[in-house]
């Protein structure tokens, strides 16, 4: 059996580190002890043996799966979707729509697991026109390629395409994009713990500066 690590991702550590710690504790209690991987997915973790990385961030899933030796991935969503140990909150059929993240656009296993989690939480999911493997970018992936104002225009355009104000996101950068676009994002980790998704830093320049500073050190 391969070694296991839990990778909360840089964005969650910046957003709500206490939830990363809480999740780590839940996984340790129910799956056995594992360390928390704090190496950013943009850097080689230099794993010495075959290691399964339990990840949250879509970018982490893509890079740890594809770019480094001795590394394979499974999303936290897949684990929780099949679990019998997590106490899911009940949202009483509240209707929400969703954005599927760019880095895992081709990973139907993740799309299916997330929708199973939403069902377990009694969320009535209204799929947008472009969803799953056919989803389109929230706008954040264009940062650094086009001007910040054009990035924000993309975010506003994406938000306007969604059928509801309440939007499930599982990428923190997607949540920032939805705040720019005037929607109310519901980050999946927040939903699992019945917490409100708050904006904190969401202007693209501010968010990417904060993220880059953290990533450079990890």
PLM regions: where:
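Iron-sulfur cluster-binding electron-transfer modules in prokaryotic oxidoreductases
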Residues: 1-218
